[in-house]
């Protein structure tokens, strides 16, 4: 079974007097365990594709599935729920808030997501070997 299946994916942007076709009929199938690389020049649509796949942006056309689940489009709440339940996303330029401790940074993220669970935050830090760093400030 395909982990990701994309059929005719499009993402067009209206810019002043022209339409920019960032994605125009993309077809792709990624099998579970398969590794791929998105390679192309600046402005070729790599980030746009990833943003659509992770439900950070809605395509203007086409269909796509993640683990057999149709990825929601044009519905902010459904897209957020899908992202929280199915997608892990590491931003290229991710920064911690320098005036908060490691633990406080995690708790802030939880609060922004609508919950706060210090035990869970500490457990997550333990899973990545940072249990002794909770009171440190990012360097």
PLM regions and their residue ranges:
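Conserved ABC ATPase "signature" region
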Residues: 5, 69-70, 116-133
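ABC-type ATPase nucleotide-binding domains, specifically the catalytic core motifs of the NBD
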Residues: 14-16, 107-118, 127
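ABC ATPase NBD coupling module
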Residues: 17-20, 71-88
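Conserved ABC transporter NBD signature motif
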Residues: 62-73
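Short coil-to-helix segment of the ABC ATPase nucleotide-binding domain corresponding to the Q-loop/switch region
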Residues: 97-109
């Amino acid at each position: 079974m395909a982990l990701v299946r994309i059929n005719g994916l499009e993402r067009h942007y209206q810019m002043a007097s022209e339409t920019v076709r960032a994605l125009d009929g993309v077809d792709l199938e990624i099998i579970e365990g398969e590794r791929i690389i998105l390679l192309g020049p600046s402005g070729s649509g790599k980030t746009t594709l990833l943003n659509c796949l992770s439900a950070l942006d809605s395509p203007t056309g086409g269909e796509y599935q993640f683990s057999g689940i149709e990825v929601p489009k044009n519905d902010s709440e459904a897209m957020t729920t899908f992202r929280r339940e199915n997608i892990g996303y590491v931003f290229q330029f991710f920064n911690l808030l320098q005036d908060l401790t490691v633990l406080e940074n995690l708790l802030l993220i939880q609060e922004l997501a609508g919950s706060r669970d210090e035990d869970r935050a500490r457990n997550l830090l333990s899973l990545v070997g940072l249990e002794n760093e909770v009171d440190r400030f990012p360097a």
